[in-house]
Amino acid sequence: MTIPAAKVCGAEKGENTMTRDELEKRNVGENLDAIMCLDPRGYGVCRILYAGSRAYTGEPTAMHAAEALCKAIHPGDPVYILVGFVLLPHKVPEMDGSVSAILLARSLVLAFGAKPIIVCPQDSVEAFKKCGNVVGLHVYEDLDTAMELPLSLGVVAFTKDKAKAPAQAKALADKILPAAVISVEACGGNAKGVYHNAVGKDVTALEAKSDVLWNELRARGVPNVAIGD
């Protein structure tokens, strides 16, 4: 069955017709995007960022990302998950992104038989070891072991030292080039290399410089998905 595009809201790509399956897929994507853009505290940033992302993808962003991952990931493939934002004033990592990352890792194992590898600040390593066990994954800092054994999760502490970050990023990419890289609330520096929190304070010294790895992997053509709030 085909449906005229004129009767479908938001057909950015200008299709003349849409099949029933395509319409259902689009509706699922629209609903997921609508949930993600809920802003009960009136923060405002989510909708601004969403507008730019939607203009880039030309379709619901959640479904766009899901389809990209489905095309990229196969059984046994490594997937890097960059996560861990260290907060002031207590200088400890926030946990909402970390919980999301560990559940995402479990989903990648169940859906694809993938080998998720968490890349985080040293502050978060112990939490991921414990949370990994909670969701039924065996956690290893030795990546060779994580890649070899089933139902496993690798964890890598990424440096906070800007000078050391490029070498570690290259070493990781050379050792294990992932099928995809996903960032879940991982902090990134601005054009001047300064890292800020949500209220504009300089947190450069607190944050893992995993954005250097992100850029290294993008330069190598690795499919990438970024998630934030």
Feature names for model-found ranges:
Residues 7-17:
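Short, Lys/Arg-enriched N-terminal segments with co-localized hydrophobic residues
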Residues 130-214:
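An acidic, phosphate/nucleotide-engaging active-site surface
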Residues 16-78:
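Positively charged, low-complexity intrinsically disordered leader regions
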Residues 115-123:
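Short internal beta-strands
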Residues 54-56, 78-79, 83-100:
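Short, glycine-rich nucleotide/cofactor-binding loops
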Residues 94-113:
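Histidine-anchored nucleotide/phosphate-binding helix
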Residues 113-114, 219-224:
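A short helix->loop->beta-strand "cap" motif at the edges of active sites that frequently abuts
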